[in-house]
């Protein structure tokens, strides 16, 4: 797969049709090729392929951090619900994260909360994308 991608990139450079890449495009390409925890350079700066929620979940597993991450996930879910793009899966994740927190399973709670927060963030992004596509679909 990596050889194919490299070959395509090389052919694009030879043909002179290389388009400028946005950060999101570069991040998504690096994440798809290398998974989380990979470092890459974009416009001279170093970044990792970790989502912000994964970074937050990597904090020390204790009650305070687990409570904060769950609260952040609930707040992000509320934003997704405001635009009517709250996924039903997320509600179950929040419930599971809360149960793990109550059981003292802080690492588990943090990991589930991070997933819930990510899904909510993607729900809001999905809303914005649908609005943009809707505007593009409406004839002038």
Model-derived segments and spans:
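Absolute protein N-terminus
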Residues: 1-2, 20-21
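Long, charged/polar, soluble alpha-helical segments
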Residues: 21-140
């Amino acid at each position: 797969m990596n050889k194919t991608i490299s070959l395509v990139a090389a052919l694009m450079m030879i043909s002179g049709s290389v388009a400028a890449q946005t950060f999101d495009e570069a991040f998504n390409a690096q994440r798809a090729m290398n998974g989380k925890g990979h470092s890459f350079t974009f416009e001279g700066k170093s970044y990792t392929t970790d989502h912000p929620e994964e970074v937050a979940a990597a904090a020390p597993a204790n009650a305070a951090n687990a409570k904060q991450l769950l609260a952040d996930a609930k707040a992000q879910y509320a934003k997704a619900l405001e635009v009517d793009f709250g996924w039903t899966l997320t509600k179950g994740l929040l419930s599971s994260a809360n149960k793990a927190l109550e059981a003292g399973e802080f690492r588990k709670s943090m990991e589930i909360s991070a997933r819930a927060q990510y899904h909510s963030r993607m729900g809001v992004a999905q809303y914005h994308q649908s609005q943009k596509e809707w505007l593009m679909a409406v004839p002038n």
